[in-house]
Amino acid sequence: MTVRVRIAPSPTGNLHIGTARTAVFNWLFAHHHGGTFVLRVEDTDLERSKPEYTENIKTGLQWLGLHWDEGPFFQTQRLDQYKAAIQTLLDQGLAYRCYCTPAELEAMREQQKANNQAPRYDNRHRNLTEAQRAEFEAQGRKPVIRFKIDDAQQIVWQDLIRGTMTWKGSDLGGDMVIARTPEGDESFGQPLYNLAVVVDDIDMQISHVIRGEDHIANTAKQILLYEALGAAVPQFAHTPLILNQEGRKLSKRDGVTSIDDFRQMGFLPQAIANYMSLLGWTPTDSTQEIFTLEEAAKEFSLERVNKAGAKFDWDKLDWINAQYLHQMPIPALTDLLIPYLQAAGYGDYLGDRPWLESLVALVAPSLTRLADVTQETRLLFGDSITLDEKATAQLQTEGVKVILQEILQNIQASTNFTPDEAKALINQATKAHGVKKGVVMKSMRAGLMGELQGPDLMQSWVLLHQKGWDIERLNQAIASI
């Protein structure tokens, strides 16, 4: 069998983490089998679909490395195909026009609720006479097209993740609406999701439909449509939902859910793709957690996708992202960090590329996300300091002023300042004044950075010295004592 899979987002919002995870699984499956990965944009919701969302989805998939082989195809450009399918179903007596008004449908639901019955359409317009139909149209009623569902029918399929799945026609809520608001006999208005998806999958020869478990009920309905249209039914695989920490489906209420959000927070695309591949799938070597999409595709199988929901683990994502950051060449990492430093107001300090790369090399081991760079480097820009409470107290320690003054004089005499020379100055001051080395180290950190915690002191000192900022800062610190 030639494997053809698709990712079919609706452009009613930015690329969501759930859609992206589904795209990852489809991409991995296609590449494992040497198949085709198709992008289809399901934009039939004209009110909510926006071109900017389409672009966001395409950009997000490409950013993640999920390049499609065919498409994008747009449902709004395929209305004739849907209308032809609807006409086929009408001609075969498998679909019909329903003229129920919203008020009638609401009254039906209220009566069912009062009778402790599940809400469903009672198929009341399935067998209208021509006279009844003419009367409804004379009243100006706009019909919908409904597909007939036999309540007694069983729908069975072998789900590639969940095994045998069985649904009854009676579980599907009555005859299904497949198009709304037709304009006369020759036009069927707007086709709805289940009909359009089936026609698309038939025309695009989709062999496997891999999507979230929230589509299981749709699958039962769609299988009936495949059969009614005389088409082969693709194989289905329903992936587990992504859950929040409370075990509920991850939603917008949880805050960060779009790929844009993750990108702005400083996650790398390869780290997100890596992590999403593990959201529900377990590699053969369960201890392996870092791999490229290509590496994951070599062993990806739906048999190793879990049925249970996958909890989104921020700590795990941070850890994976850090692994990629720490392995990245400094020049490439510097390029990625510059926008964050510019946004933080440090743009004036970024012109010296060798110095900037040295700064990045200093803080890189401390980075978990790209956005962390502003916090990790904030004490290393400019010729002035702001002393916090602990640094102020350290500078008030007896003898510190004299120590800093002597070190300052020695710095000014240095012609090639290195970390080793910085250590030598610390050791010299320690011996000369008979104090513990820690006192001198803490005092220098306070005087150079204004705080007692931060990056490696010697490396930081050298970077500051290369700009002449260490002298200015120490003068400021000494003046405050």
Swiss-Prot record:
Keywords from the named record: Aminoacyl-tRNA synthetase, ATP-binding, Cytoplasm, Ligase, Nucleotide-binding, Protein biosynthesis
Top-level EC class: ligase
EC number(s) on file: 6.1.1.17
Residue ranges of the motif 'KMSKS' region: 249-253
Source species, domain of life: Bacteria
Location relative to the cell: Cytoplasm
Function: Catalyzes the attachment of glutamate to tRNA(Glu) in a two-step reaction: glutamate is first activated by ATP to form Glu-AMP and then transferred to the acceptor end of tRNA(Glu).
Summary of subunit composition and partner proteins: Monomer.
Record-stated family: Belongs to the class-I aminoacyl-tRNA synthetase family. Glutamate--tRNA ligase type 1 subfamily.
Official protein name in the record: Glutamate--tRNA ligase
Highest classification ranks of the organism: Bacteria, Bacillati, Cyanobacteriota, Cyanophyceae, Oscillatoriophycideae
